[in-house]
């Protein structure tokens, strides 16, 4: 299957300008949510590693999920995510021990929440860090609105 690449950001809607006050006459254009996916292994992230996911500058992260086919195991089943080798700027250590989907969030941390709201003036690379080696295998899914804050 072939793919098409847009430089974005991409907006969609069929009423481009507001000409009235009722539905159908009020602008309804919105941003398209983008997604990037990276395979993750617990053993491969025992030392912080780049996931290969790069979020464009001024983007708004709306959701991060870990979809495990094998739950993380060992002394700790945690993973953390960030924008550097520290790998904690986006998600603090969170258990991903179960098979299936686990939602990863900034929690109640103001600094992490602000980074989700706007990644800043530069593209950011997502790093993952597991607490220890283990059997965990899955896909990291990051959904974002491209350059919403530009």
Question: Where are the model-predicted features located?
Answer:
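Surface-exposed, low-hydrophobicity beta-strand/loop segments enriched in small/polar/acidic residues
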Residues: 2-150
